[in-house]
Amino acid sequence: MKKIILTGGGSAGHVTPNLALIPKLKELGYEIQYIGTESGIEREIIENEKIKYHVISSGKLRRYFDIKNFTDPFKVIKGIFQAIFIMRKEKPNVVFSKGGFVSVPVVFAAYINGIPVIAHESDITPGLANRLSSPYCTKVCVTFPESVKSIKGDNAVLTGTPIRQELLDGSRIIGRRMCGFQNDKPVLLIIGGSLGSKFINNTVRNCLNELLKIYNIIHICGKGNLEEKLTERNGYVQFEYVSEEMPHIMNAADIVISRAGANVIFELLALKKPNLLIPLSRKSSRGDQILNAASFEKSGYSMVLKEEDMTPKLLLDKLKKLDMSKHTYINKMKASAVQDATNKIINLIEKYK
């Protein structure tokens, strides 16, 4: 039987594209296994899929000073040896890496064992993990045309980001019913990323009274960020994190406020959802979300609001403008040529079976 090992973790963005590939890989007869960390978000997500999960040690790749920067390299080295053992025991035909710090030991181990590695980079510029790993990859799938030049050599392949079929099959009716909405107001979905965004959460809650005059609101606010005093507010539903229900939640939305991680913005594109993107600022990130948002704004898929400019008043103004021009955005998204990433990646994997 053909065997593939998937890896990627640290945030949901390093896991969900793997989920999009799993049903097709199963159809093609692959035995699928996964390598991740013991406590990462990837573990619960993957184990819910009933896929064999291997735990390895991994350090975090930081761009700032931290005392752990001196100890984490030893965790990475330990992770490489653990991954080498897994590779030699399981003997996969190919490894697919979605990035994140856990992927680095896995890619190195596969390379040492002569196992082909296909990596995927969602953002315009590669993250630190993929920059370290890409020289050891057979091919690197990229999402944006601008990304091809960021990968050294000629092993970059433009595929786009795979979208889970169940996301496309979600039900607007079920999503609204899940949230208990009792009126026909349009639904505003707020996504702060899998780890949440206190900045977005606070700004939204500071203008909640005005927003609720216009919208029913679904607010995915991140773990530990629920506001207890708002749990009984009519028309306002909070979730720390959404997994299985996400297809219905996304399809229930009429307008979306979101961070600008590549996975979520391509999901919004696939679903043709008018959206206001609030990318992470350069103070909090390497600036990849700013580039992602700029690309989507240029293509006419998204309206953008800089985090440093964001106030309750400006947020309300932007949403009003977005609502007035939503059909223009929808038509632009309908004309997009970026699609079918799942099959493109699967076809690439099949070359190395």
From Swiss-Prot:
Membrane topology of the entry: Peripheral membrane protein
GO MF term (any one): undecaprenyldiphospho-muramoylpentapeptide beta-N-acetylglucosaminyltransferase activity
Enzyme Commission number(s) of this protein: 2.4.1.227
GO CC terms of this entry: plasma membrane
InterPro entries per record: GlcNAc_MurG (IPR006009), Glyco_trans_28_C (IPR007235), GlycoTrans_28_N (IPR004276)
Keywords, alphabetical: Cell cycle, Cell division, Cell membrane, Cell shape, Cell wall biogenesis/degradation, Glycosyltransferase, Membrane, Peptidoglycan synthesis, Transferase
Pathway connected to this protein: Cell wall biogenesis; peptidoglycan biosynthesis
Localisation: Cell membrane
Sequence positions that bind UDP-N-acetyl-alpha-D-glucosamine: S11, A12, G13, R164, S194, Q289
Catalysed transformations (reactions): di-trans,octa-cis-undecaprenyl diphospho-N-acetyl-alpha-D-muramoyl-L-alanyl-D-glutamyl-meso-2,6-diaminopimeloyl-D-alanyl-D-alanine + UDP-N-acetyl-alpha-D-glucosamine = di-trans,octa-cis-undecaprenyl diphospho-[N-acetyl-alpha-D-glucosaminyl-(1->4)]-N-acetyl-alpha-D-muramoyl-L-alanyl-D-glutamyl-meso-2,6-diaminopimeloyl-D-alanyl-D-alanine + UDP + H(+)
GO BP field: carbohydrate metabolic process; cell division; cell wall organization; lipid glycosylation; peptidoglycan biosynthetic process; regulation of cell shape
Pfam families per the UniProt record, alphabetical: Glyco_tran_28_C, Glyco_transf_28
Function, in words: Cell wall formation. Catalyzes the transfer of a GlcNAc subunit on undecaprenyl-pyrophosphoryl-MurNAc-pentapeptide (lipid intermediate I) to form undecaprenyl-pyrophosphoryl-MurNAc-(pentapeptide)GlcNAc (lipid intermediate II).
Family: Belongs to the glycosyltransferase 28 family. MurG subfamily.
HAMAP family documented for this protein: MurG
Protein name: UDP-N-acetylglucosamine--N-acetylmuramyl-(pentapeptide) pyrophosphoryl-undecaprenol N-acetylglucosamine transferase
Species assigned in the record: Clostridium kluyveri (strain ATCC 8527 / DSM 555 / NBRC 12016 / NCIMB 10680 / K1)
Lineage: Bacteria, Bacillati, Bacillota, Clostridia, Eubacteriales
